[in-house]
Every structure is written in structure tokens, then in C-alpha cells.
UniProtKB/Swiss-Prot annotation:
<dbReference type="InterPro" id="IPR010089">
    <property type="entry name" value="Flavoprotein_WrbA-like"/>
</dbReference>
<dbReference type="InterPro" id="IPR008254">
    <property type="entry name" value="Flavodoxin/NO_synth"/>
</dbReference>
<dbReference type="GO" id="GO:0016020">
    <property type="term" value="C:membrane"/>
</dbReference>
<dbReference type="GO" id="GO:0005737">
    <property type="term" value="C:cytoplasm"/>
</dbReference>
<dbReference type="Pfam" id="PF00258">
    <property type="entry name" value="Flavodoxin_1"/>
</dbReference>
<dbReference type="InterPro" id="IPR029039">
    <property type="entry name" value="Flavoprotein-like_sf"/>
</dbReference>
<dbReference type="GO" id="GO:0010181">
    <property type="term" value="F:FMN binding"/>
</dbReference>
<keyword id="KW-0963">Cytoplasm</keyword>
<keyword id="KW-0020">Allergen</keyword>
<comment type="similarity">
    <text>Belongs to the WrbA family.</text>
</comment>
<dbReference type="GO" id="GO:0003955">
    <property type="term" value="F:NAD(P)H dehydrogenase (quinone) activity"/>
</dbReference>
<feature type="domain" description="Flavodoxin-like">
    <location>
        <begin position="5"/>
        <end position="195"/>
    </location>
</feature>
<protein>
    <recommendedName>
        <fullName>Minor allergen Cla h 7</fullName>
    </recommendedName>
</protein>
């Protein structure tokens, strides 16, 4: 049976959503199906307005209950970084998964990461490393991007770009004005590679 996949993301200025949609495209091109969910916002509208954050995309449902993820085999997730770790919105979501941790509901499921930072050296790799603790506590199997299909992109130093072997990524700029580059979007081929990897598993 084909794996059931959900991409979960939090995006302030839309950069992570752009990556999420590109990852979903890769999964579909590989023959898979995927659902997208937004992690709920924790900032007030007043703060978001001062940050010049655009409105959320209401066509993508919020994941209001972690139980929803129990219905999926794999859930790659994307988020910006805050001090080299999950932002508060993601931390709040994970803090609500105590029931799943207690019952092992996420044990043996698969996940990958894609990350947005403001600048080069802004925490893409440290955020991925920090995420390993949460994934390990849940028994979630991490599938990295790796070099197999991306060495020609990750090894190209002709321009500044996000992403690493841990997963796809982008730089937003301190004010959110920089959009994902063509090369960063090419690295969301991670979606296709992830699907091909987990499709080898016999999900029952």
C-alpha cells in the first residue's frame, strides 16, 4: 500500500510554504499523494502586522489536533528557525503531543525537514540537529536529504543558498524580502527522493 503523507509547516512570510508546496509537487511527480497542513499561529495579529507578515493561506487547513498525524505514515515538516531551534509555533505544537508520546502513536513513522533562516549561518543545520531530540523521543525515523540526488546542487558554491544534507532550505533575509532561489527550489526534489525512499517500505 502506498504511504500516506502529510506535509506540516509553519511560515511567517510565506517562504516555508513555498518550499512545502514544491516538496508536495515532487511527491506527486513521483506518484504519491500528499496533504498539506499549517501549524497554528501563536503571535497576535498586532505583532504580525508590525512584522509585515502576509495573511495565512486559508486554503491549507490548520493542524489543530496532533491526532491527525496518527493517520499518516510520513510527515516531512518545514519551519523557520529561532535561535537555532524550533520557533515557538512549532514548539507549541510538539508540546501538545504528550499523548502520542505516551502511547507511541508516532513510533516508526517517517519524517524529513526543510528549514528557512534569515541569513547564511543562521541556524539551518543546528535547527535540524535540535529537531533530532524531538523525533527520537517519539521514535520517528528521520530521512535526510543526503547527497545521492543533490550533490551537483549542494556542491555548487557559485551562489549563496540555503539547504544542506539535512534537508532543503532557504534564506529569507532579515526582513523576509528574499524569496527562495531557483536552486533552493530545485533542492526541494527532496520531496520526490523522500517518497521514493519510503515507498519501499511495506505499509499495512
Amino acid at each position: 500500500m502506498a504511504p500516506k503523507i502529510a506535509i506540516i509547516f509553519y511560515s511567517t512570510w510565506g517562504h516555508v510554504q513555498t518550499l512545502a508546496e514544491a516538496e508536495a509537487k515532487g511527491i506527486r511527480e513521483a506518484g504519491g499523494s500528499v496533504d498539506l497542513y499549517r501549524v497554528p499561529e501563536t503571535l497576535t495579529q498586532e505583532v504580525l502586522t508590525k512584522m509585515h507578515a502576509p495573511p495565512k493561506d486559508d486554503s491549507i487547513p490548520e493542524i489543530t489536533d496532533p491526532f491527525i498525524l496518527e493517520q499518516y505514515d510520513r510527515f516531512p515538516h518545514g519551519h523557520p528557525t529561532r535561535y537555532g531551534n524550533f520557533p515557538a509555533q512549532w514548539r507549541t505544537f510538539w508540546d501538545r503531543t504528550g499523548g502520542q508520546w505516551q502511547t507511541g502513536a508516532f513510533w516508526g513513522k517517517y519524517a524529513g525537514l526543510f528549514i528557512s533562516t534569515g541569513t547564511q549561518g543562521g541556524g539551518q543545520e543546528s535547527t535540524a540537529l535540535a529537531a533530532m531530540s524531538t523525533l527520537s523521543h517519539h521514535g520517528i525515523i528521520y530521512v535526510p536529504l543526503g547527497y545521492k540526488t543533490t550533490f551537483h546542487l549542494l556542491g555548487d558554491n557559485s551562489e549563496v543558498r540555503g539547504a544542506a544534507v539535512w534537508g532543503a532550505g532557504t534564506f529569507s533575509g532579515g526582513d523576509g524580502s528574499r524569496q527562495p532561489s531557483q536552486k533552493e527550489l530545485e533542492l526541494t526534489a527532496q520531496g520526490k527522493a523522500f517518497y521514493e525512499a519510503v515507498a519501499k517500505v511495506n505499509f499495512q
